[in-house]
A protein has these predicted regions:
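Structural register within alpha-helical repeat arrays
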Residues: 45-47, 79, 111-114, 145, ...
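TPR alpha-solenoid repeat register
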Residues: 25-27, 75, 110, 141, ...
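Terminal, low-structured helical/coil segments at or just beyond the last alpha-helical repeat
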Residues: 11-18, 167-197
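N-terminal alpha-helical interaction modules that lie
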Residues: 1-84, 95, 195
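Short coil turns that delineate tetratricopeptide repeat
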Residues: 36, 70, 104-105, 136, ...
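Conserved structural position within tetratricopeptide repeats
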Residues: 66-67, 98-102, 130-137, 167, ...
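Structural signature of tandem alpha-helical TPR/SEL1-like repeats
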Residues: 22-26, 50-61, 85-98, 118-130, ...
Length: 197
């Protein structure tokens, strides 16, 4: 039985090394699940830190964590994000994000995934508006809202969506972003202001 974070991390590292040699994701999942079944969620989280960019490790590990700690908002977000990155689909991601929001309404990552998981662009804009209102300093949420409003304006010739996009980009520009962001925002605004819907 694995007893420590170091032991669990070593077992995960060995599993990943074998995966890198064989490219057998099924064996990797099985080995990660075996480790996950022998340690506490806290130990497993710590052991997974070096592999946080590998959904192949995170998914089976965090499925176990979430099954043992279903109210752990951050674990739900980590699992939802790994699912999102591997194309698992908006329904499962949205469900996990909603559970994370219920567990911790202040978890911005949960709100972001909840908004991303909406497949209807008009509804996605509405979700990003909710996130931006809840977290007014969240520039990423506001940029996502503006990007989605731009898509909506383009696809449906919606002048209200265009106005929302322009106002939001203008507010981001007014916050004195770094030069590269400023240039991108200015270019975007120039383009959008020239649209005829």
């Amino acid at each position: 039985m694995t007893s420590s974070t170091q032991d669990a991390a070593a077992e995960l590292r060995a599993a990943v090394q074998e995966y890198e040699r064989t490219d057998n994701v099924g064996v990797l999942f099985d080995r990660v699940r075996t480790v996950a079944a022998t340690v506490s969620p806290a130990v497993l989280k710590d052991a997974c830190v070096p592999f946080r960019e590998m959904p192949e490790v995170i998914i089976p590990a965090y499925e176990q964590i979430v099954s043992q700690a279903p109210g752990d908002a951050q674990a739900l977000v980590v699992l939802a994000n790994a699912y999102w990155l591997t194309g698992r689909g908006p329904d499962v991601v949205g469900d996990l994000a909603s559970r994370a929001i219920a567990a911790d309404p202040e978890n911005r990552g949960a709100w972001h995934l909840w908004a991303l998981a909406e497949s209807n662009v008009r509804e996605r804009v509405a979700r990003w508006q909710q996130v931006a209102q809840r977290f007014p300093g969240d520039q990423l949420a506001r940029a996502a809202m503006a990007d989605n409003a731009t898509s909506l304006a383009s696809a449906e010739h919606d002048p209200q969506a265009l106005d929302l996009a322009i106002r939001t980009y203008e507010s981001l520009l007014a916050e004195s972003p770094p030069a590269a962001q400023r240039s991108a925002l200015e270019h975007t605004l120039k383009t959008l202001r020239g649209w005829q819907l």
